[in-house]
């Protein structure tokens, strides 16, 4: 269910200086103004939603910097208010459209990308809006470091099948699948489940008996 639009959200974000990045150029030019330890690995979540996943990651892994990207101001306000309950030097958030991600981040500057429960855009004519469409993946390949991973989770069967069969397996010269499951929560004692941090949507889907699908992949050397 979508949140009711908060007309004051853009103004709220502009007034905030803790966790919120209001100058996108800082991510390319001066990470030291964003993170206390800018030399740490950088993991990003595209479409961070209300922030449960990325905030918990930042709490558990102080040795990694986390950047949450979300294009809807109303949603990122919710995430920001959750983050304010903690004192974290390794977390930042920005309201930004992933279509323009090459304007936001330098080449080979990112160590991992998380795509969690992205909008499935079910209609064929909207396929290019899917975050696992090749037009997005080509951009992700530019900002990712050598051998860096993309981790993709979804409850949506059609989006997952599209990602696996129409994208990743369609060109084996571009992508390498390192982990794949059609039902993450059945993998008892598997490291992927043991380390899993659920998003707010994921918790609801699991309670409803939905199968959570996941794939980890990377871009092959000659295509980065």
From Swiss-Prot:
The active site is at 119. It is an enzyme of class 2 (transferase). Pfam families: Methyltransf_4 (PF02390). It catalyses: guanosine(46) in tRNA + S-adenosyl-L-methionine = N(7)-methylguanosine(46) in tRNA + S-adenosyl-L-homocysteine. Substrate binds at residues 123, 155, 199-202. GO terms for cellular component: tRNA methyltransferase complex. Keywords: Methyltransferase, S-adenosyl-L-methionine, Transferase, tRNA processing. S-adenosyl-L-methionine binds at residues 45, 70, 97, 119. Its EC number is 2.1.1.33. GO terms for molecular function: tRNA (guanine(46)-N7)-methyltransferase activity. Pathway: tRNA modification; N(7)-methylguanine-tRNA biosynthesis. Coiled coil: none annotated. PROSITE patterns: SAM_MT_TRMB (PS51625). HAMAP family: tRNA_methyltr_TrmB (MF_01057). Catalyzes the formation of N(7)-methylguanine at position 46 (m7G46) in tRNA. Belongs to the class I-like SAM-binding methyltransferase superfamily. TrmB family. This is tRNA (guanine-N(7)-)-methyltransferase. The lineage of its organism: Bacteria, Bacillati, Mycoplasmatota, Mycoplasmoidales, Mycoplasmoidaceae.
């Amino acid at each position: 269910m979508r949140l009711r639009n908060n007309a004051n959200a853009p103004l709220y974000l502009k007034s905030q200086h803790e966790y919120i990045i209001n100058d996108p150029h800082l991510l390319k030019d001066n990470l030291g103004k964003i993170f206390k330890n800018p030399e740490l690995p950088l993991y990003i979540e595209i479409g961070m939603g209300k922030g449960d996943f990325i905030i918990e990651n930042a709490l558990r892994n102080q040795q990694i910097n986390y950047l949450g990207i979300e294009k809807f101001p109303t949603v990122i306000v919710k995430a920001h208010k959750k983050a304010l309950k903690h004192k974290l030097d390794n977390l930042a958030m920005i309201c930004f459209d992933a279509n323009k991600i090459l304007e936001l981040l330098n080449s080979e500057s990112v160590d991992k990308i998380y795509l969690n429960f992205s909008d499935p855009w079910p209609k064929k004519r909207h396929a290019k809006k899917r975050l696992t469409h090749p037009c997005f993946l080509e951009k992700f390949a530019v900002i990712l470091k050598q051998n860096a991973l993309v981790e993709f989770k979804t409850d949506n069967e059609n989006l997952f099948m599209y990602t696996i069969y129409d994208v990743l397996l369609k060109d084996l010269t571009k992508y390498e699948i390192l982990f794949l499951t059609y039902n993450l929560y059945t993998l008892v004692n598997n490291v992927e489940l043991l380390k899993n941090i659920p998003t707010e949507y994921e918790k609801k889907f699991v309670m409803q008996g939905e199968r959570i699908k996941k794939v980890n992949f990377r871009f092959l050397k000659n295509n980065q």
